[in-house]
């Protein structure tokens, strides 16, 4: 211990030995009564190393000290965000696989849902982990400053793409209900992909000013060490263009679609003529019956049977609208708090408490991220095809098992037997009708003979003459 003391040092302690450079006292938990000596820097470092758990690190903004302060605590919010990230990535990968592998799901609406799942999956891969990292560092940006603008750009891009996809789905279904023939004729896979490309192009255009101006001026994307949009114009214009305007279009077209479906269903129930007219616009595959048989069936068909196909298609549309309505509702409910609070932070900048607004934004943004994880759960609960596909993919079965031959025979033989019995009954009825018709013919012949016997002989002679002439 002698090497730690200076030869001519006084025996009274100084403040430099027990006080940090910034003047704040630190409780080391050691009493230097024995000797009351002034320690050197080496002794100060030893005491600090033995008691570093008592450090407060106030005013210390260096990354090692900052990470030491926050990483030692149990961060339950970071754990919850990690669960959201895993659910988002895994669920949306299942949606992408289902639409890619299941032929039943390969239509325009599901292509939009697959593109929406891609946006949500990329949000879970590229945006959410960095946001979780900022939570671990006390909402301060731990990465290089140039990456802040890129991260905000990706966040706005994928969030805007989500609302744009839902808006496009709502518009596409409304057009399909209003003009089904034109929509079915021009709604090919290529056209669906062109619409998806247009959605992504609009989303990129809306979010592109963020990296353009943010990389030139850090003050637009940094505020007190936190990475966020600090420009009020960005916040206001971006909120309206990327959320509120598409939200208005989506809600209006969705309710117009519901109204049109209800109107068609009412027409199908009330007016038989309209049912017959609408039945020709059915998207279901036509049967292989000949035109003559279809004409004969249309003659003997009951009035209420004309609209069965149309009612079935309308029922399917209503079910699809129900599922999409749940997706729309959850998206709106989960993202509205963030955008409303974001606008309030700009409008009431002086009167609002910035700490409360910042805390609300940190919570509401993760509620919005949660909507990306909820969509696959909605598909699973309300769509049988998605549910069966997800269960097979989890079991590493990527192809649907075909029914064995026994099940095919069991399902087809009773139907064939029923049809054959119906044919036999029809033949018996036809034979009875033929027998009745022959009896009537015989009776008519007998009456004719009796009438001919009672007739005068001169008439018979004239008839014989006519027959001989023929």
From Swiss-Prot:
Annotated InterPro entries: 5HT2A_rcpt (IPR000455), 5HT_rcpt (IPR002231), GPCR_Rhodpsn (IPR000276), GPCR_Rhodpsn_7TM (IPR017452)
Extracellular side: 1-80, 138-146, 216-232, 348-355
Any GO molecular function: neurotransmitter receptor activity
Residues carrying covalently attached carbohydrate according to the record: 38, 44, 51, 54
GO aspect biological process, one term: positive regulation of ERK1 and ERK2 cascade
Phosphoserine sites (modified residues): 280
Principal subcellular localisation of the protein: membrane
Residue spans crossing the bilayer: 81-97, 112-137, 147-171, 192-215, 233-258, 322-347, 356-381
Transmembrane listed as a keyword: yes
Keyword check for Membrane: yes
Bias (Low complexity): 10-21
Motif (PDZ-binding): 468-470
Annotated spans, Disordered: 1-23
Membrane topology category: Multi-pass membrane protein
Residues involved in serotonin binding: 155, 342
Short sequence motif named NPxxY motif, residue ranges: 375-379
Location within or outside the cell: Cell membrane; Cell projection, Dendrite; Cell projection, Axon; Cytoplasmic vesicle
Biological function: G-protein coupled receptor for 5-hydroxytryptamine (serotonin). Also functions as a receptor for various drugs and psychoactive substances, including mescaline, psilocybin, 1-(2,5-dimethoxy-4-iodophenyl)-2-aminopropane (DOI) and lysergic acid diethylamide (LSD). Ligand binding causes a conformation change that triggers signaling via guanine nucleotide-binding proteins (G proteins) and modulates the activity of downstream effectors.
Subunit: Interacts (via C-terminus) with MPDZ and PATJ. May interact (via C-terminus) with MPP3, PRDX6, DLG4, DLG1, CASK, APBA1 and MAGI2. Interacts with GRM2 and DRD2; this may affect signaling.
Name of the protein described by the UniProt record: 5-hydroxytryptamine receptor 2A
């Amino acid at each position: 211990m002698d090497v730690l003391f200076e030869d001519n040092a006084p025996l009274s302690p100084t403040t430099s030995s027990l006080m940090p450079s910034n003047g704040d006292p630190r409780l080391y938990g050691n009493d230097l009564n024995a000797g009351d000596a002034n320690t050197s820097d080496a002794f100060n470092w030893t005491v600090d190393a033995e008691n570093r758990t008592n450090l407060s690190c106030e005013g210390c903004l260096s990354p090692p000290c900052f990470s030491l302060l926050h990483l030692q605590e149990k961060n339950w919010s970071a754990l919850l965000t990690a669960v959201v990230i895993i659910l988002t990535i895994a669920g949306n990968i299942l949606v992408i696989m289902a639409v890619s592998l299941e032929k039943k799901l390969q239509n325009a609406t599901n292509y939009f849902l697959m593109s929406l799942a891609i946006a949500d999956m990329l949000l879970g891969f590229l945006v959410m982990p960095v946001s979780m990292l900022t939570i671990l560092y006390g909402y301060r940006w731990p990465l290089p400053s140039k990456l802040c603008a890129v991260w905000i750009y990706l966040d706005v891009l994928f969030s805007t793409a989500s609302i744009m996809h839902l808006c496009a789905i709502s518009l596409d279904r409304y057009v399909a209900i209003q003009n089904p023939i034109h929509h079915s004729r021009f709604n090919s896979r290529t056209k669906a992909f062109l619409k998806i490309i247009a959605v992504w192009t609009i989303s990129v255009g809306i979010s592109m000013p963020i990296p353009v101006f943010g990389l030139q001026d850090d003050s637009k994307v940094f505020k007190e060490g936190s990475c966020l949009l600090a420009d009020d114009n960005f916040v206001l214009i971006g909120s309206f263009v990327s959320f509120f305007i598409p939200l208005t279009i989506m809600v209006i077209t969705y309710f117009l679609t519901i109204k049109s479906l209800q109107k068609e269903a009412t027409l199908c129930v009330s007016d038989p003529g309209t049912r017959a007219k609408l039945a020709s616009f059915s998207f279901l595959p036509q049967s292989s019956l000949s035109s003559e048989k279809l004409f004969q069936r249309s003659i003997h068909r009951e009035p209420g049977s004309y609209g069965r196909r149309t009612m079935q298609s309308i029922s399917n549309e209503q079910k699809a609208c129900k599922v999409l309505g749940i997706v729309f509702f959850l998206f709106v409910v989960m993202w509205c708090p963030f955008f409303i609070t974001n606008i309030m932070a700009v409008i009431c900048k002086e009167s609002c408490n910035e700490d409360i607004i910042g805390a609300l934004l940190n919570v509401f943004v993760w509620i919005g991220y949660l909507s990306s994880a909820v969509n696959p759960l909605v598909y699973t609960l309300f769509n049988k095809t998605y549910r069966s596909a997800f269960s097979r993919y989890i079991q590493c079965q990527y192809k649907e098992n075909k029914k064995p031959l026994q099940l095919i025979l069991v399902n087809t033989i009773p139907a064939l037997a029923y049809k054959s019995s119906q044919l036999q009954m029809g033949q018996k009825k036809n034979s009875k009708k033929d027998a009745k018709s022959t009896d009537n013919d015989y009776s008519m012949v007998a009456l004719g003979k009796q009438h001919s016997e009672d007739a005068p002989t001169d008439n018979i002679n004239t008839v014989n003459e006519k027959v001989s002439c023929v």
